[in-house]
From Swiss-Prot:
Its EC number is 6.1.1.1. Homodimer. GO terms for molecular function: ATP binding; RNA binding; tyrosine-tRNA ligase activity. This is Tyrosine--tRNA ligase. It comes from the Bacteria. Residues 355-421 form the S4 RNA-binding domain. The lineage of its organism: Bacteria, Bacillati, Bacillota, Bacilli, Bacillales. It comes from Bacillus velezensis (strain DSM 23117 / BGSC 10A6 / LMG 26770 / FZB42). ATP binds at residue 235. The gene is tyrS.
Length: 421
């Protein structure tokens, strides 16, 4: 086994592989071209896309030539894989716009200027968009038997609930991508999530039927990322964790990784970082012997946040996290508060308005009544910008505002409210 496949195996990144011996031989003999596809089903990639992206990067670091394929055409159709119902089709204008955004995001992870093996971005609309219906049916469709397609999980799982011809044909279009890249770019390997196995093997079958005998192409799937507690990876109460900082702030992104379960953290270090085997094994031991220190989680959060958002964003995320943990909220800038308290309930007040702390506690619903608000203050349960306030007659002034824009109220340990001005 090549060093690359050994590393992927150590990291648990190989779910299934076609012709392991043949692929191993191919990787030993030459630096190959490989691809993974990303359909623009939203205006940003999310952390579920990180695994195939980083796997492409691992191949590039080993000297191979990655192709990131944006599905400008297949994104108009919709992949039935893993879906229980028909997707809502997006307009071409939206798919074009999203394709460009995804292309920009991919450029953060792959080196498009590497001297000997630069990554390449392709868009399957460039060839599928030119394909006439006659060409599609005669040259591509004739290679697929209905029984063969019905046997694939992506189709068979939808027979009961129903599947349109549009989504039924997705497998054929993705197969045509592989054939086109094989012919035009000499691309010999497709990588995808475990739910793509049926589509990948269909592409290999199309290459086998369409090309001369002895055509060499391979498929490799990576595992579905799971969580030990059974909840869906990449989702929080606030929704998906996106790679776009406007949709998921670097602070929220960092916090997602910091909160990784001890049972998952070593697996995620293998999946999502480029730490060596020795470093990962050292963190595994630390998690075993001193889990309360959460050293592995901190390193995981640092590595992935830098990878996706850069060093400066990591430093801001760490600063906000430390300030919130210690209660030193006054140390934060207005921008930090805006990021760190994005999902906290809030209302807006005029700076000239006289605000009684008791009234604000009731209006914000931190306290159910004025009587309870006074008790909360007297009992030391109320904090303004992290500092305890015990004066029941306190009026909020400019001194209670962070950069004259925000006041952060807290009752007890976890109930926050944000006043904006």
């Amino acid at each position: 086994m090549t060093n690359l496949l050994e590393d992927l195996s150590f990291r648990g990144l190989i779910q299934q592989m076609t012709d392991e011996e043949g692929l191993n031989k191919q990787l030993n003999e030459e630096k190959i071209r490989l691809y993974s596809g990303f359909d623009p089903t939203a205006d940003s990639l999310h952390i579920g896309h990180l695994l195939p992206i980083l796997t492409l990067r691992r191949f590039q670091l080993a000297g191979h030539h990655p192709i990131a394929l944006v599905g400008g055409a297949t994104g108009l159709i919709g992949d039935p894989s893993g879906k229980k119902a028909e997707r809502t089709l997006n307009t071409q204008d939206i798919v074009v716009e999203w394709s460009q955004k995804i292309k920009n995001q991919l450029s953060r992870f792959l080196d498009f200027e590497a001297g000997e093996n630069p990554a390449v971005i392709a868009n399957n609309f460039d060839w599928i968009g030119k394909l006439s219906i006659i060409e599609f049916l005669r040259d591509v469709g004739k290679n697929f038997g209905i029984n063969y397609m019905l046997a694939k999980d992506t189709v068979s799982s939808r027979i009961e609930t129903g599947i349109s011809y549009t989504e039924f044909s997705y497998m054929i279009l993705q197969s045509y991508d592989f054939l086109n890249l094989y012919r035009e770019k000499n691309c010999k390997l497709q990588i995808g999530g475990s739910d793509q196995w049926g589509n990948i093997t269909a592409g290999l079958e199309l290459i086998r039927k369409s090309e001369e005998e002895g055509a060499k192409a391979f498929g490799l799937t990576i595992p579905l990322v799971t969580k030990a507690d059974g909840t869906k990876f990449g989702k929080t109460e606030g929704g998906a964790i996106w790679l776009d900082k406007e949709k998921t702030s670097p602070y929220e992104f960092y916090q997602f990784w910091i909160n990784t379960d001890d049972r998952d953290v070593v697996k995620y270090l293998k999946y999502f970082t480029f730490l060596s085997k020795e470093e990962i094994e050292a963190y595994a031991e630390k998690t075993e012997t001193a889990p309360e220190k959460r050293e592995a989680q901190k390193r995981l959060a640092e590595e992935v946040t830098v990878l996706v958002h850069g060093r400066e964003a990591l430093e801001q995320a760490v600063h906000i996290s430390q300030a919130l943990f210690s209660g030193n909220i006054k140390e934060l800038s207005a921008q930090d508060v805006k990021v760190g308290f994005k999902d906290v309930p809030s209302f807006e007040k005029d700076r000239s308005e006289e605000l009684s702390l008791v009234d604000v506690l009731v209006e914000s619903k931190l306290s159910p009544s004025k009587r309870q608000a006074r008790e909360d203050i007297q009992n030391g349960a109320v904090y303004i910008n992290g500092e305890r306030q015990t004066d029941i007659g306190h009026l909020l002034t400019a001194e209670d505002r962070i950069e004259d824009q925000f006041t952060v109220l807290r009752r007890g340990k976890k109930k926050y409210f944000l006043i904006t001005y």
